[in-house]
Amino acid sequence: MNHDVIRTASLCAAAVCTLVFTWSAGAQQSGAPAAKRTLVRAGHVLDVKTGKLADAQTIVVVGDTIQSIAPTASVTAQAGDAVIDLGGMTVMPGLIDVHTHLTMNPDFDPYRELTSTSAKEAINGVVNAKATLMAGFTSVRNVGASGFVDVDLRDAVNAGQVPGPHMLVSGPLLGITGGHCDENLLPIQYHLVGDGVADGISEVQHQVRQNIKYGADLIKICATGGVLSKGDDPQASQYTLEEMQAIVADAHRLGRKVAAHAHGAQGILWASKAGVDSIEHGSYINDEAIAEMKKNGTYLVPTLYLEDWQIEKGSLPPFYHQKMVDVSAVAKSNIKHAVQAGVKIALGTDAAVYPHGLNAHELDVYVNQIGMTPLAALQTATVNAADLMGWSAKTGTLESGKWADLIAVEQNPMEDVRVLQDVKFVMKAGVIYKEVTK
């Protein structure tokens, strides 16, 4: 993600309120609280653990929770129940994207982005959170935002002020001076520094604690250089092993997981050795890094569709474009090797490098370019992603006691994952956000 354009800012409450009234009016129709019970009648229910379909099922929802799933013939509607008949559609758990930037958009004039305000980023977040939810993604990790804008966005979603997915958020990214997570566009006299720049053991410990103080659910660091940043090399390590060990130790002690942006093999290796919970991107991963990740149970979060979209449709400045071309030339083959070797994969998209709401296109890449089975691909966006987020008890599968997060599509995604690019029905925590149109 373009961390040159992440600036110190705070969420402007008025910016969120700009769109609250529009949302509130719609909520009276499709986002109203569920009745005492909601019966969701499905033609088929997909078990994402096994890939098996159960035909003619009814999901009984009470409040924000799944109460039961049973054959429709055995479930009788009671007075006061709301009944949602999805006909022959296939119902499955809401999807999860563990690498988003909801407060940003794919506008790649980095100098124009320097003029963006906290109010603009807040409005972006409100619009993009809704687009993501309506695309069938009911949970996300937001891994990078200026000034804790994502913290307040998360809180607004949780309070029901705006529609959006369940969120875990990182706030500002931690990185070295002059690195991918710093601000490198202006000369020294402008004193432009990234929110989370920290060098050395004591500084990184302070930054971890500060991010947590202001509401971060996880810590995001830059272990290597990046693509959408000026003056650095994606293959070059940035944080040292010792700095990352200090970050992970403090974060884990305080109950937070750590995600590491890492393209280069050395940075991937060190980050996994340090104990991070996920590697984001992993473009130049090699056998040594793969072995370390498997030993430690580190998740890999590929972000591959963005390369196709950017090269075909994007308008990157020259100092970004060549790096994107170089990375895309090797990333898919390296990620395919990691998948074949058994590295754990969770779906992440880097949404904001391409338009929000297209998140499900990542699954098509996994199946048709990386060689995953449809079931393995679906698991990256459900059970695996839930596990990485620490939410396996809450979401990732359709089971009694879990959040009533479910989506419906017209065909079986086990036969063609591309059907998930056109989700017809979305329920999150028992609230219907997208209804089937006749």
Where are these regions (language model features)?
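Alpha-helix-loop-beta-strand connector modules within alpha/beta enzyme cores
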Residues: 155, 159-173, 235-260, 301-302
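Divalent metal-dependent hydrolysis catalytic cores, especially in the metallo-beta-lactamase
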Residues: 124-150, 164-172, 216-229, 257, ...
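His/Asp/Glu-enriched, well-ordered alpha-helical/loop segment
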Residues: 253, 318, 327-413
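Bacterial N-terminal signal peptides
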Residues: 10-22
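Histidine/acidic-residue-rich catalytic or RNA/ligand-binding cores of hydrolases
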Residues: 107-110, 150, 229-231, 268-274, ...
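Metal-associated gating/positioning segment near the N- to mid-region
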Residues: 86-161, 177-180, 184-187, 242, ...
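Active-site gating loops and adjacent loop-to-helix segments of metal-dependent hydrolytic enzymes
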Residues: 103-121, 177-193, 227-241, 296-328
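Histidine-rich, glycine-flanked metal-binding segment
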Residues: 31-36, 45, 50-92
